[in-house]
């Protein structure tokens, strides 16, 4: 798939959805009840992907609603310092807060996240706050699945998708399923399918595609066959330690292994994967190489304490691949 058309546009990528605060446990190998210190980072899948792609050298913008308080200002400054354009970032005027995620690291295999997302600002982004003039400056618009979980954010995202299609902006859909935000699985399947059928690139885990299909034990062949009846050009399905697969509408199949690393935590891998995979496509690399970039970036992030701060550079990604091969 060619992401290099419209090179005259201001942004390579605009991401849409939540930006929140991650509070990651500094003390490892102990439960939350015994953890006393945390480090603060910017979090939220679309914010992390904006950060990851910006660190890789892409021109990036962000659309989302944040709190008008200290946490909101922290998020905005952090992203601006990475040269991420925040003209699409809206401040909530009704006292809503950004989400908080406390992470627990009992062991590399036993990590959990304690979420505080009641009445959060990001889910109150409205359709009126979506600018066509902003979206049409992008080559790709990335949608995060969690932004579809509630109204009015849901309608804002659907408007953004419609404007992207109208203005020949390619759509990438990162499924980003978070069960704590959704009312029921039927609702998830409906809205995921609405966006997936309009997306050019769809990225998710096998379990996330099962949520979209409202089933258990789905098969990649059936998933790609359905999506290729619609807009999709590339479908990426991740299988954890078994690696990941990319399928194209032209009938090609590619596979990348998961790179071995010393795992510190299990979260953050998906956002770094999406960032590096898209970077590979923007760089004109083959899909096979883009898959390797995604897998390598995920391996790097799970070996480090944060998600956003740990997003790797292109040199770090290429060095890991070269070392492994």
From Swiss-Prot:
Gene3D superfamilies, per database record: 3.40.1190.20, putative 5-dehydro-2- deoxygluconokinase
Swiss-Prot/TrEMBL catalytic activity: 5-dehydro-2-deoxy-D-gluconate + ATP = 6-phospho-5-dehydro-2-deoxy-D-gluconate + ADP + H(+)
Record keywords: ATP-binding, Kinase, Nucleotide-binding, Transferase
Pathway involvement of the protein, from the record: Polyol metabolism; myo-inositol degradation into acetyl-CoA; acetyl-CoA from myo-inositol: step 5/7
Pfam families: PfkB
Superkingdom: Bacteria
Biological processes per GO annotation: inositol catabolic process
Annotated SUPFAM superfamilies: Ribokinase-like
E.C. number(s) listed in UniProt: 2.7.1.92
Key word Transmembrane helix present: no
A GO term for molecular function: 5-dehydro-2-deoxygluconokinase activity
Top EC group: transferase
Key word Nucleotide-binding present: yes
Family to which the UniProt record says this protein belongs: Belongs to the carbohydrate kinase PfkB family.
Role description: Catalyzes the phosphorylation of 5-dehydro-2-deoxy-D-gluconate (2-deoxy-5-keto-D-gluconate or DKG) to 6-phospho-5-dehydro-2-deoxy-D-gluconate (DKGP).
The protein, known as: 5-dehydro-2-deoxygluconokinase
